[in-house]
């Protein structure tokens, strides 16, 4: 049956039904079903989050100063982002300001996470959708060295011997029959287009990125004490500054500042000399693969982040842009007010929650987390062994957030789409430079590859910002400012009887918001609306589909039984299902079984 959605997509649930469950190389648990016609083109898509989030329920009645420590445990991949958003929400509610040094340190920690997350995503979660490590065994190491020197002449690891050593390591993997992290790939699928030398170069950088990621996160251990889940503080940051101290536990001294500086330099070198060149090199072989646009050229949302000055979240003060684009009008960027109940609402008509009446949308301050697991009449299978979900009923543990009634895509591509705003010429120049280097039109941005490219551009931009705030912190310290926390309102006796606030960040995956209500010194209500809630949204009461589902439509599959193309597009969002949902079914049993590896 063919239907037209209000947000402009044609769905046809006839044809062959393909089930990908679980979707791997993501954080959390996700299921995807698509219908494919006789030409191998996807005509319908259904995205299901298969875990239930209960942390909002856990937070009720707790001390708001502790909320960051709970919300941070939502996810270990985007570690720290939920904590930062949480302390901002509580500070917003209680009118707490933070010192300039705390703002710089928070920004550096968030920027460090952006860089780390984007590198891990590109090489370890997404690259294998485009790169064939088995094909790398056919490469000529000398030709690979020449390719590396042409793509990135500044990267020092480029000799034929270096690539030959990596190739020999790969050969041992393959000959042993134990492919490990390369197991279960569709390596003979014609969707893979790279020549062997490009495959060897990219696989080598995959291994280099593994080594880099353990160094990058040391910034979090320096300022936050550990990683994952560094420590945070309502009112600032928990690390005192003692530049003359040597080895002082927990204090920031010159030794630690020098280490931070060296990590920033290493991140910058890798991003500029490996990550961005690899993106261009790999993308150059897939320039015609412009599927996966979905909502990206139509409706996008960015909260913005990285305030230049503490306590000022006005759009003009944010280094990462804020704004919303709807109806495909890239020339009009709407401002975003997350406190406005007319702007942000969540719907649950197709989610396993209950709001009491159909079609009701709730602003997060009034949001509810009341599970209601029920399956539709057209389900194929059983409650614990679902063959095909019924998308006409409830089918996901993810809610359906909407901005002024519109399904929105969030993430680095959404932020990139907002650069028509005055004050972000540096981002605009990045985008124009990439398109010029790859000889692509602006329309190419609104695709799976464009989404992936936006992450790389954001990583490079964040490297520059991290250096900016490091220099700002050092200058403040030299001028005698060592303040890192404001504890004037730490005591609950200074708080109002009732208060509410909102915290926002631009997480690596996109717009993240926490809304809190405080009463008598305790959390009365707490709601998180996370990037994958926006992107992984099921249908709403009007039939609008979310970003995941929209992005898969009209994609041509080489072999429907080997869903390389589905994984490419879903991975381009870097889904984090643990952030958007938590815990399995009430019985603790898996809801589905694997249909396609």
Swiss-Prot record:
Keywords per UniProt: Cell membrane, Membrane, Metal-binding, Nickel, Oxidoreductase
Cofactor: how and how many bound: Binds 1 nickel ion per subunit.
Compartments in which it is found: Cell membrane
Top-level taxon of origin: Bacteria
Chain ranges passing through the membrane: none
Assembly: Heterodimer of a large and a small subunit.
Protein name: Uptake hydrogenase large subunit
Gene: hupB
